[in-house]
């Protein structure tokens, strides 16, 4: 509830929803997604982010859950796509950047780092590398395509998460 009290402009009824959407995309969402390209985010964490985002969008639109308006309609009126897709987009952009770097770049060395020894008992933690491979499989892309910067940027832009 504190976010609503502090947000002033975003919850102001005099400002159009379209302008609020632009403000949300340029100020709030980047703060929410800060360094998201490096997160090995789980489905549960992604869901929490989407719930948080929808609560903010509903507050901005002046809509409550009691009004029974679908999330897709609210997203369409504010012109904001799902945050999970934006996180995936930023992860793919960072992956392309990493793939094109030299082999002696520290980020690339860390990505390929294999730690010897035994892991703890239980399910292995999701790694960034695993999440990237999952994203590539989901989209039907190949690792080598990231080496062509123009192609990679078009691919990412074609799968743009935000409606125009």
Annotate each predicted stretch with a short phrase.
Residues 1-164:
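Short linear motifs embedded in intrinsically disordered, charge-biased segments
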């Amino acid at each position: 509830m504190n976010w609503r009290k502090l947000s002033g402009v975003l919850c102001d009824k005099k400002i159009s929803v379209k302008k609020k959407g632009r403000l949300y995309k340029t100020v709030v969402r980047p703060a929410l997604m800060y360094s998201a390209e490096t997160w090995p985010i789980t489905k549960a964490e992604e869901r929490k982010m989407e719930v948080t985002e929808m609560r903010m969008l509903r507050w901005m639109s002046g809509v409550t859950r009691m009004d029974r308006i679908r999330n897709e309609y609210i997203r369409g009126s504010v012109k904001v796509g799902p945050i999970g897709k934006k996180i995936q987009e930023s992860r793919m952009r960072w992956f392309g950047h990493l793939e094109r770097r030299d082999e002696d770049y520290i980020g690339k060395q860390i990505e390929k780092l294999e730690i010897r020894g035994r892991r703890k008992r239980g399910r292995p933690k999701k790694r960034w590398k695993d999440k990237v491979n999952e994203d590539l499989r989901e989209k039907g892309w190949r690792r080598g395509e990231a080496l062509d910067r123009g192609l990679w940027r078009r691919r990412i832009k074609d799968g743009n998460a935000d409606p125009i």
